Amino acid sequence: MKVILLFVLAVFTVFVSSRGIPLEEQSQFLEFQDKFNKKYSHEEYLERFEIFKSNLGKIEELNLIAINHKADTKFGVNKFADLSSDEFKNYYLNNKEAIFTDDLPVADYLDDEFINSIPTAFDWRTRGAVTPVKNQGQCGSCWSFSTTGNVEGQHFISQNKLVSLSEQNLVDCDHECMEYEGEQACDEGCNGGLQPNAYNYIIKNGGIQTESSYPYTAETGTQCNFNSANIGAKISNFTMIPKNETVMAGYIVSTGPLAIAADAVEWQFYIGGVFDIPCNPNSLDHGILIVGYSAKNTIFRKNMPYWIVKNSWGADWGEQGYIYLRRGKNTCGVSNFVSTSII
């Protein structure tokens, strides 16, 4: 493999050197291709290289922003480094913006005595309620992963059994809608969806299938293949959680992992640390799952509080598939659209 890589590097170096492209960028691009097994057609090769070079500049800029904000956030070359910003949004984010409408059910605020008694750190992964990180692929189905993650947690807490549930069941079969300002926001597979709609589908459908019986394909199927004999979990209702991060922590401890929506545009090159740079809390374009919270010391701050957020971009992204979001500042709108199913 090393011999092949060296040969490709030599050929590529001769090709791009005539165009005045720095050798360092050439080397980085070839290392990127090797690490992430990227294959391009002849026509696509230079286009991807140009995007990669542009993204190197963006990564440098993001790291400077993090330093200026005394943030622990780290950005770097990852598997998305050959995608333009528009491609990243189209492939991996949700084109159904999450909006908290007045007709959605909302849970009560928790008792102050209970809130004051919750632990300083809590993680449902260590308690067995969280399945391994999944990968939505180039399909805007994040909403389905956020939903299944929540229901998986609720089912575990209720039945003491962790069952991986089928996102594809939702992608193919869920066409529920909610209304906002006279317009319909419907679940449309890879074209986006919302967790409240998905909960309603599961309730009306009498359950959701297991992952093993209805595996994920990263594309919207031409038909629904639901089989009631393979139901993995059922729910009876759902509720939104008040827009309050202290209350959110209480509900995580008392009820389980929470489905949320957030602004993830700046997550493209995230590789680690606590995300704490400016983003848009009013543009909720990605569905994810909060599984716990904690705090850490950084070079800038002691006891930095953060949320532990499970993503659906594979375990080779971020912190082994997770992102840590600064807690207490409504980072990226983390508290604006929070929900949980009810068994």
Curated annotation (Swiss-Prot):
Phosphoglycosylated, contains GlcNAc-alpha-1-P-Ser residues. GO terms for molecular function: cysteine-type endopeptidase activity. Disulfide bonds join C139-C190, C173-C224, C279-C332. CDD domains: Peptidase_C1A (cd02248). Pfam families: Inhibitor_I29, Peptidase_C1. Residues 19-117 form a propeptide. Residues 1-18 form the signal peptide. The active site is at C142, H286, N311. PROSITE patterns: THIOL_PROTEASE_ASN, THIOL_PROTEASE_CYS, THIOL_PROTEASE_HIS. Keywords: Disulfide bond, Glycoprotein, Hydrolase, Lysosome, Phosphoprotein, Protease, Signal, Thiol protease, Zymogen. Its main location: other. InterPro entries: Papain-like_cys_pep_sf, Pept_asp_AS, Pept_cys_AS, Pept_his_AS, Peptidase_C1A, Peptidase_C1A_C, Peptidase_C1A_papain-like, Prot_inhib_I29. It is found in: Lysosome. Its EC number is 3.4.22.-. GO terms for biological process: hyperosmotic response; proteolysis involved in protein catabolic process. GO terms for cellular component: extracellular space; lysosome. Belongs to the peptidase C1 family. PANTHER family: CYSTEINE PROTEASE FAMILY C1-RELATED. Cysteine proteinases 1 and 2 are believed to participate in the breakdown of protein during differentiation of Dictyostelium as a response to starvation. This is Cysteine proteinase 1.
